[in-house]
Regions:
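Alpha-helical metal-binding/catalytic segments enriched in His/Glu/Asp
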Residues: 1-30, 77-81, 94-114, 201
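Acidic/histidine-rich catalytic neighborhood of metal-dependent amide-processing enzymes
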Residues: 1-70
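Glycine/acidic-rich beta-strand-loop module
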Residues: 21, 174-205
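Fold-independent oxyanion-binding glycine-rich loops
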Residues: 25-26, 55-58, 81-84, 180-182
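Acidic-enriched catalytic cores of C-N bond-cleaving enzymes acting on peptides and small amides
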Residues: 44-45, 60, 69, 90-182, ...
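Structured core elements
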Residues: 54, 78-80, 119, 176-179, ...
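Flexible glycine/proline-rich, aromatic-decorated loop/lid segments
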Residues: 66-82
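Short small-residue beta-strand/loop micro-motif enriched in glycine and branched aliphatics
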Residues: 85-91, 186-187
Length: 214
């Protein structure tokens, strides 16, 4: 969208300022080269600007141009739990030895309450309060829950209570299990107490939240 707007302004001779483009192709792998490149002295002058406009965002719809004023950050990590030094038979050891998959499932299950609220003490301490006026502006966007559900293939939307879908997408932090593994998952069945379990977990963070603190 921004590129087409630039193209139009050049074509109509209405461009009011200089414009610099930075194309970065490593976002999906964590942008390992970008930070190092940006801090080089010879690039600081090249990148100097009054305003930065990020194009890696969505539009409300393909017919409604959108400018995002913020993006949620990310805190991600892997949690690994260990139990016995090898898998055990649940008929012989069930009820006497802690099962890492059971414990991991319980731990993950305590992070969110029934209203979609993250229960970790202090998690929301630094979350900026969005004013009623700002929330009203967010919800003026032409958006439909029904269309959204259809686009992602679900019948019911889920999320933090007392916030709209647009608010939950943009101004509220979230917790998600990105992957979980443990025990036997092959063909057939093995009645075991697994020796370990792990999960890949992520938090989407909002303005003022520090991923190191989280």
């Amino acid at each position: 969208m921004q590129a087409k707007a630039f193209e139009t302004m050049v074509a109509t001779n209405t461009l009011p300022c200089n414009v610099k483009f930075l194309f970065e192709g490593e976002e999906e792998i964590g942008s390992p080269s970008l930070a190092e490149w940006i801090v080089k002295e010879e690039n600081k002058k090249l990148l100097k600007a009054d305003v930065i406009l990020v194009s890696d965002t969505d539009m409300v719809s393909d017919q409604v141009p959108s400018i995002c004023t913020g993006l949620r950050g990310l805190c991600k990590f892997e949690m690994r739990l260990t139990g016995p030094d090898h898998d055990l038979h649940s008929g012989d050891f069930g009820g006497t030895v802690s099962n890492p998959v059971n414990v991991l499932s319980w731990m993950i299950g305590t992070v969110l309450d029934k209203d979609g609220h993250i229960t970790i003490p202090g998690f929301y301490d630094d979350v900026l309060v969005v004013s009623p006026e700002e929330r009203a502006l967010i919800n003026q966007a032409p958006y439909s829950d029904d269309a959204y559900k259809k686009s992602v293939g679900v019948e019911v939307l889920h999320g933090e209570k007392d916030y709209t879908t647009l608010e939950r997408i943009g101004i509220r932090p979230t917790f998600d299990v990105c992957g979980i593994q443990g025990g036997y998952s092959g063909e057939g069945f093995k009645t075991i107490i697994p020796s370990e379990a792990w999960a890949k977990l992520s938090f989407r963070l909002v303005a003022a939240q520090n991923p190191q603190r989280i």
